[in-house]
């Protein structure tokens, strides 16, 4: 964009033109020369940058118009007043500002459109490095590893006496989020047969051995062969050394007021999620111990007694002892509830998968009916003749009922003797009665034997063979 300015070539021409118009002032001539010089100097730069050239052209034209207005106002000073000059100059200034704002917006838009971020080139995947606060940098190349191996950063220096929030957590088989160290000690205890050890969680190991194993656990190592009583003691010590015990969020009054199983369950729901998960893990651990009561001599009361002092912290020893008794009853109730739920789940699974399908009318096959009759008879016989693990929890109740029924049957069966050599075969689920009568039946006993067909109940039929 070029503008040609015409200047007078000789003084005569300028003098002749002064009659028709006013001669240009020296200031206008100097301004024109400066403008031409500016155009000549910036021509090379404008040729390289079109946006800058466009901006300078607009600025130049705005300045030219402004100078023309000033020159006209100076030549026509007698014709217009000062108010008109101010309005014209203000209008010219506004027009120049408006044009400059439009031009700047257009130039910024063009610059943004011209700026495009391209895809990276010559990319090479060297390594994938992740950071774990417990294991440090994982996947770091060898050349970037420090020469001196340092310990992996961790939120805590030890695994005993620290909060669960600063420990590495894992999920157990029941979905409880508990510290990993507890799961490691539990697996080690189970693999070495700790549940079958007599007095587990009641007998203590030597202090020197426990301290040595504790140091190895703090360094992150699990010894291969550890005494099961040492492991049990460390599990109790972990709960005992917590900064905030599992049941500290509950007041002693709340625990003491719980008298029924439903109240205990409602109280467990008041625990925070972390403490509730730890309590559920501990209850299931104690329930696993109680299931081997016939080997380890630890029933629900004994295991609850040894765990109760580790579940709470109190300053007064006398108050702590009294409170531990209430905590023991609380834990004992939860353990028995867990054992009962396990037994019910086993029974439900047994009913969910019958041995043989029934026919369309709903009647069972003969072998299935015989199996059910056998199971019913086995529940009413003495527990010494049956080796079924599913009926161990209810053996005492069944034996009490059988005692009353046996007394009634013995009074009705005094007129004949009892000959029995029957045995129960658990593998075939059938009752095999081997009746070997004596060489000669006693006189007067045949009438009693014929009365067996008229015995109404199943119990009387069973007791008649005795």
Curated annotation (Swiss-Prot):
Domain of life according to the entry: Eukaryota
Compositional bias (Basic and acidic residues): 65-74
Keyword tags: GTPase activation
Domain CRIB: 117-130
UniProt keyword annotation of Transcription present: no
Single Gene Ontology BP annotation: signal transduction
Compositional bias ranges of the Polar residues kind: 363-376, 383-397
Role, per record: Acts as a GTPase activator for the Rac-type GTPase by converting it to an inactive GDP-bound state.
Protein name: Rho GTPase-activating protein 1
Source species of the chain: Arabidopsis thaliana (Mouse-ear cress)
Gene: ROPGAP1
């Amino acid at each position: 964009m070029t503008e040609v300015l015409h200047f007078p070539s000789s003084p005569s021409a300028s003098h002749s033109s002064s009659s028709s118009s006013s001669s240009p002032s020296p200031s206008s001539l100097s301004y024109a020369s400066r403008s031409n010089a500016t155009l000549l100097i910036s021509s090379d730069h404008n040729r390289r940058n079109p946006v800058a050239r466009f901006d300078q052209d607009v600025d130049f034209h705005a300045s030219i118009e402004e100078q023309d207005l000033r020159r006209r106002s100076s030549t026509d000073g007698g014709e217009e007043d000062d108010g008109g000059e101010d309005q014209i100059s203000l209008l010219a200034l506004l027009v120049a500002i408006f044009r400059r704002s439009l031009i700047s917006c257009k130039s910024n838009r063009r610059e943004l459109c011209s700026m495009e971020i391209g895809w990276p080139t010559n990319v090479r995947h060297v390594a994938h490095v992740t950071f774990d606060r417990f294991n440090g940098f994982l996947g770091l190349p060898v050349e970037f590893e420090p020469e001196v191996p340092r310990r992996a950063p961790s939120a805590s220096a030890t695994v005993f006496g620290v909060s669960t929030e600063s420990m590495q957590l894992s999920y157990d088989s029941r979905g409880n989020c508990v510290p990993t160290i507890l799961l490691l000690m539990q697996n080690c205890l189970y693999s070495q047969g700790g549940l079958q050890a007599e007095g587990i969680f009641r007998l203590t190991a030597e202090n020197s051995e426990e301290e040595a194993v504790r140091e190895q656990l703090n360094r992150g190592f699990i010894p291969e062969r550890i005494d099961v009583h040492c492991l049990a003691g460390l599990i109790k010590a972990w709960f005992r050394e917590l900064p905030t015990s599992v049941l500290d969020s509950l007041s002693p009054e709340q625990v003491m007021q719980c008298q029924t199983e439903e109240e205990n369950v409602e109280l467990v729901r008041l625990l925070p999620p972390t403490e509730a998960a730890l309590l559920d893990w501990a209850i299931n651990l104690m329930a696993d111990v109680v299931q081997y009561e016939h080997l380890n001599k630890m029933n629900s009361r004994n295991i609850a007694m040894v765990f109760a002092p580790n579940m709470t912290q109190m300053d007064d020893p006398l108050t702590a002892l009294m409170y531990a008794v209430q905590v023991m009853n609380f834990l004992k109730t939860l353990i028995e509830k867990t054992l009962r739920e396990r037994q019910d789940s086993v029974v439900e699974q047994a009913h969910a998968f019958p041995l043989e399908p029934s026919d369309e009318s709903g009647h069972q096959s003969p072998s299935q009916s015989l199996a059910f009759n056998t199971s019913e008879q086995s529940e009413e016989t003495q527990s010494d003749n049956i080796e079924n693990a599913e009926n161990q929890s209810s053996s005492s109740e069944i034996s009490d009922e059988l005692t009353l029924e046996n007394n009634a049957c013995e009074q009705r069966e005094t007129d004949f003797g009892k000959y029995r050599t029957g045995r129960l075969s658990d593998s075939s689920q059938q009752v095999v009665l081997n009746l070997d009568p004596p060489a000669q039946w006693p006189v007067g006993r045949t009438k009693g034997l014929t009365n067996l067909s008229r015995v109404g109940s199943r119990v009387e039929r069973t007791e008649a063979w005795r």
